[in-house]
Design a protein with these regions (language model features):
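An N-terminal assembly and electron-transfer interface module characteristic of large anaerobic redox
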Residues: 1-470
Length: 470
């Protein structure tokens, strides 16, 4: 992968034609993403949204034995504090760049922060996260990193997140994995092959259910999910194959392992729902190096499915129309599970979409061809779409589910739930039916005043989305 020689990886927009604004059906989006050059959409009015800095902060906080130095003013530290309060993570410092520093530079503050990080925590690795201000004052982070790496004898790794190169937050994950591949993950020629499959899941991925399934099926794995370790990342170079829980977040690592080290990555859908989990486990079991017999894998799947099916009889959706608002891989998996429960997928609201999602979009175009909205952090577009579609149930994350509830729609927030594996089936189904059968909160919230005037809500959902003109 020639990108490793470069200072930065290409953005998702350049590599895969990623879109962060779209309104249409599944077939139309698939057609657009299959074009040689995707026509980008821009918003004439944009409310909020995560950027690459936030994505990088989340992933860096999940690397065990590390300290992250956020080279920025206090604002980026506030984002990190929010992430830590929500999910915990590794230690971090902020250099507190001030007004003069943004013009004259803050190299001294950066070096002092590295010294303090090493004295305080004796970490295995130190990351220096550059932020938009550093893109302005042009601090020489590389020189500081090289100097301190020689001084302390541990990797000091720069991660360059300018905040405005890409409109997709997942590019922040690409930046972190690119930095690890460039500076840390070097293959040991004497290392023995690892008879296992790399289990890859990044920031925010809950894994207890799917790990229980892998153990029950007798599948050997190198755990690169949840809280990552440098040792496991290095071992990944010797595995026989890689499989992701969520390919959106980990795609750069998957592709780099395959292109640079010949470790094939299994293009399987997320292990959500009965069929999705079964397909995923069978793919992992078929990969070279998977321990345990085919009979053991099949026996475990049949037993776990039978237990889940019994529980699902009490949690049918009975034709309810559902609006799913999640990142792409999760959204497709949950949508399939909704159909397993007897629900109807009215619309998919995604954070982004790119050429890697074309196959799934084609599948849905052949099913119910639901509407697709790409609208991360755009409450106006979300409320407008919900008001026009009037679904029976909304499935999304907590901060966005509030908007659906205020619109009078039963809402289920799934970010606190482990949706993966057969255990995820038994955890997710009751959450959905409980929200659908107990709409009192939504009725109460909808009785209040709207955050948007009627004139705004009368506009089309894509009123502020325009095609880029070249």
């Amino acid at each position: 992968m020639n990108e490793i020689r470069q200072r930065l990886p290409r953005t998702r927009e350049k590599r895969r034609g990623a879109l962060t604004a779209f309104y249409g059906d599944s077939a139309a989006l698939a057609d657009e993403l299959e074009k040689e050059e995707t026509r980008q959409r821009i918003r004439t009015y944009s409310e909020t949204g995560d950027d690459e800095v936030i994505g990088a902060i989340r992933l860096l906080g999940r690397i065990r034995g590390s300290v992250t130095i956020i080279h920025s003013p206090p604002g980026c530290g506030a984002i990190k504090l929010e992430d830590e309060l929500r999910a915990g993570g590794s230690p971090w410092l902020i250099t507190n760049i001030e007004e003069n520093d943004s013009i004259l530079g803050a190299d001294d503050k950066l070096r002092e922060a590295v010294d303090r990080a090493y004295r305080t925590w004796r970490p295995e690795i130190i990351f220096i996260l550059a932020t938009p201000v550093v893109a302005i004052n042009n601090d020489d982070i590389q020189s500081a990193a090289t100097e301190k790496e020689d001084q302390y004898g541990i990797p000091v790794v720069p991660v360059y997140a300018a905040g405005f190169r890409s409109k997709t937050a997942v590019y922040g994950y690409d930046l972190v994995f690119h930095a690890l591949a460039k500076y840390v993950l070097k293959k040991d020629p004497d290392a023995l092959p690892l008879p296992a499959v790399n289990l890859i899941g990044t920031a925010g991925t809950k894994t207890s259910h799917i790990i229980r399934d892998l153990d029950g099926a007798g599948i050997s794995y190198n755990n690169l999910s949840g809280s990552l370790s440098i040792a496991a990342l290095k071992q990944s170079l010797n595995a026989f194959a890689s499989i992701a829980i969520d390919k959106d977040d980990s795609r750069f690592l998957l592709e780099w392992l395959e292109e640079a080290h010949g470790i094939v990555h299994l293009e399987e859908t997320a292990p959500i729902g009965l069929a999705g989990t079964e397909r995923w486990l069978l793919a992992a079991a078929r990969s070279a190096g998977a321990a345990g017999s085919a009979e053991q894998v099949r026996a475990y799947i049949e037993e776990a499915k039978a237990a889940a099916v019994t529980d699902l009889e009490w949690h049918r959706l009975d034709g309810a129309s559902v609006f799913i608002d999640l990142p792409p891989e999760q959204a497709f998996g949950v949508a399939e599970f909704v159909e397993e429960l007897g629900g109807k997928v009215a619309a998919l609201s995604l954070t982004h979409a790119d050429s890697s999602h074309v196959v799934r979009l084609r599948e849905w175009a052949g099913r119910s061809n639901p509407q697709v909205f790409i609208q991360q952090g755009q409450p106006f577009e979300k409320i407008n779409a919900l008001g026009k579609l009037k679904p029976d149930l909304y499935i999304g994350r907590g901060e966005a589910a509030v908007w659906a509830a205020r619109a009078g729609i039963a809402a289920a927030a799934v970010d606190s739930v482990d949706v993966y594996g057969f255990g995820g089936v038994q955890e997710l189904a009751p959450l959905l039916t409980k929200a659908l059968r107990n709409p009192s909160l939504s009725r109460y919230l909808s009785a209040g005043s709207s955050s948007y005037r009627a004139g705004w809500l009368s506009k089309s959902v894509n009123w502020h989305i325009k095609q880029e003109v070249k």
